[in-house]
Structure formats: C-alpha cells, structure tokens
Amino acid sequence: MIRSIQKKWYKYQQAKKAKSFDSHWYMRFGWLEQPFTSLEQLDSLFEIHSPRKFTFADSFYAYENDRHFIFFEEVDDEHPVGFLSVLEVFKDGTYTSPEAILKLGYHLSYPCVFKIDNTWYMVPETFSNKTVELWKCTEFPLKWEKHSNLLENIEAVDSTPFYHEGLWYLFTSTRRDCKKFGDRLDLFFTEDILNPNWQEHPMNPVCKGKIQYRMAGKPFFYRNKLVRPSQDSLKRYGGHIELKEIIKLSPKEYEERLYETIYPEWNKEDDGCHTIDVHSNFVVVDAIRLTKKDN
C-alpha cells in the first residue's frame, strides 16, 4: 500500500519534470583498477551517447580475441520498435559506430549475451512475440541465427540465463497474475539450455511486490557475494538498481535479500539506471540523462 501511494506521488513529479526536461538513455563503461567492490568506482566511467533521435540502453559486455564489445538496444524515437546493435570499445574511452545485428518485426531489447565453450549465444527480450528466444552467433559479433524458443506463449521480459551448480536457471519477469512487469520474479531451470526441458520453480513467483523485481543484468559476484541486479521503478521506469544477494538457489529453494542500492549519483543530471553488466574489472551500465528543454 505504501509503495502504491509513493508511486502516485512520483508519477506526478515525473510529469512535472517532463514539462521542463528532455530525457534519453545512454551507456557508461570502463575498466576499473580492481574488481568492482565499491559504488564509487562507477563515478569515472566513459560515456556513450546516441544521436539525437536514438536511444542506447540495455547494455551487455562481451570479450573476444582481445577485443571488447558492448551489445545493446537501439530505439529510434520516431519508430520505437527496438532493435539490437553492437559496438567495440577501447581503453582510451573511444568506440566504433554502432552496427545493427538484429532487426525483426517485433520489439527487441536486453541482448543478454553469454558463451558456451567457444560459441556465443544471446537471449534477447521478445515479449511482444510472446516468446523467450535463444539466438546463436555464427560470425562474431554481427551474424546471428535463431537457435530455438526457450519458452512460448508467455509474456516475459529481461530473461536472464545463469549457470549454477550444474543447472541452467532462467530468471524472468512475467505478468502472470499481476499488472506490471517487475511485480514478480519467476524462475525456471534445466540441465541443458541448448536442448532444454524447462521446469518451473515450485516457489514461483520467487519474489512478488510492486515493480521492484525485474532483472537488471546478469548475476555477478560483488564483495564475494553472489548478487542479482534488479530494477526498482518506484520513482520512474528504471529509477535505480538494487543488488540482491542470492542466499539460496536450487530446484527447490530460492532466497534473496537486499544488499546494495545503485543510484545514478555519478552525475546530477542523471535520473535513473536500469541495467548493469560486470565482468571482473569491466563495468557497463546504462543511465538516463535529463537536459533542459529549449524555450
């Protein structure tokens, strides 16, 4: 009840803010001097801003043949059907021009890339097609082909595979018995993600609340704790990221607790963040920047 009241207040505040400010999503990336253990390490990252009519968000990192790549969602403000792109980044903060890797007749976002043996795979968000899809890279990083549907006849967003103790788990947010994505978190598991026989976790939904459980990237270790990044959209869509410590994860149990909160305090003009990808000392995070409207 309290969050519902707070949400109405923040919605009013965001409507007022929209009258004076434009906003756009952009990406921040960089190499840290040591593995990610402190939020202050996010303050000095490089920035990648999109052309005026485009949006860059939902960023994921890939390292291949001593090269560094960021996969992400692009949206054209005039034709807001998301598609997926990639660019290469360098340690001096420079980067290549984006190249599209996947455009379909339905919205694509959240290109969660991961590697099995020597092959790259991707689970993009395809909820508007009522699927959770697995794509295989045939020529890195630009060419991809559909491998299979992991789940069908389901509205699910920000689906994130994670290999743990001999099993593949799929974290995802659905709208089953709730109004908005993020109100619940669901888990599925299988032994082989390439030839899956998904089982639904008996505790589903493993988390349930008010727009606070949607995935915000892949689980990673932070201060020697396994954490799951999740979005809290109380203030606005993509308001901030919460790091939830995963205490129990098995085919029978799931338990997490709030461990740390990431607010976009690196720049006073930023108003939110909703995806983070961490690999040892490399971090990429998206954020939303406000700019004063021209009078």
Q: What is the predicted role of each segment?
A:
Residues 1-295:
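Carbohydrate-active catalytic/glycan-binding domains of CAZyme proteins
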